[in-house]
């Protein structure tokens, strides 16, 4: 993730703001087009006639989507997954900048239609999110500790979403060194009673004090997909647990199972 992304996290309000009350199953979603970082720009623009162009340029600097970059033919081309209804090839790029890897990315995009009416995605910019597989453990109670029990917060806003086979999280935690090693893993704690239980494990490697900083991480839910398909489910409820600075927390996410065999 590029350094400026951390700054953007603090400046932006949400274009796709997720409001969920942790520890309950209540979860709603709404759309907002207001960016807090633009307030000062609008104030200055009222004094200058060149405001419109400057405002348009500044809007492009802020992320307005979390997408999946899906390589084709080894990355020679790729598709951009924006939502269940919006996906297609980029209109201004050919090769995937991430090669043959499928990754989640934070981006500023615009939906377009070609001459045949097919959807294409114009990419103003994008920045990859660290993307990894959720982990299935045989002895979760014993093995969880080795993955870390440090505390972090899951940000209730843009960037925290479950879609396209991924749990993407925007998190915040205390740290002194932005470049220090830290590990975040998602553990599938499957049982007959709770088949879709997930535990977020964080190891700060000792760097768990200082100022708070935010970041993004995405987990591919392949193991959850297998369990759900085995149970004949197309939609399931994920139960996520993590250790926060206020104590142990949990929340629920509705998840539409990804099926790549279609």
Could you describe each region identified by the protein language model?
Residues 3-18, 24-26, 60-262:
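First exposed extracellular module after export/assembly in secreted or surface-exposed proteins
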Residues 40-43:
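Conserved "right-hand" nucleotidyltransferase catalytic core of DNA-directed polymerases
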Residues 52-55:
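Bacterial signal peptide processing site
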Residues 25-38:
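Bacterial N-terminal signal peptides that target proteins for export
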Residues 46-50:
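C-terminal motif of bacterial Sec signal peptides marking the signal peptidase cleavage site
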């Amino acid at each position: 993730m590029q350094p400026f992304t951390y700054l953007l996290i603090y400046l932006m309000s949400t274009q796709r703001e997720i409001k969920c009350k942790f520890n309950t199953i209540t979860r709603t979603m709404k759309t907002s087009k207001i960016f807090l970082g633009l307030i000062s720009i609008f104030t200055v623009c009222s004094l200058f006639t060149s405001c419109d162009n400057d405002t348009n340029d500044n809007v492009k600097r802020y992320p307005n989507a979390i997408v999946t970059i899906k390589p084709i033919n080894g990355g020679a081309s790729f598709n951009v997954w924006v939502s269940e209804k919006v996906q297609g090839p980029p209109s201004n790029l050919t090769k995937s900048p991430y090669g043959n890897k499928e990754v989640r990315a934070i981006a500023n995009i615009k939906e377009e239609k070609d001459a045949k009416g097919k959807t294409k995605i114009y990419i103003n910019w994008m920045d990859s999110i660290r993307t990894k597989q959720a982990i299935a453990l045989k002895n979760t109670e014993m093995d969880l500790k080795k993955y870390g029990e440090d505390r972090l917060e899951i940000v209730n806003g843009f960037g925290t979403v479950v879609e396209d086979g991924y749990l993407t999280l925007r998190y915040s935690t205390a740290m002194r060194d932005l470049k220090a090693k830290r590990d975040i893993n998602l553990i599938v704690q499957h049982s007959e009673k709770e088949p879709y239980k997930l535990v977020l494990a964080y190891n700060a490697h000792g760097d768990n004090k200082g100022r708070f900083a935010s970041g993004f991480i995405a987990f591919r839910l392949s193991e959850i997909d297998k369990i759900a398909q085995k149970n004949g489910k197309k939609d399931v409820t994920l139960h996520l647990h993590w250790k926060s600075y206020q104590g142990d927390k949990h929340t629920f996410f509705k998840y539409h199972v990804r099926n790549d065999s279609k």
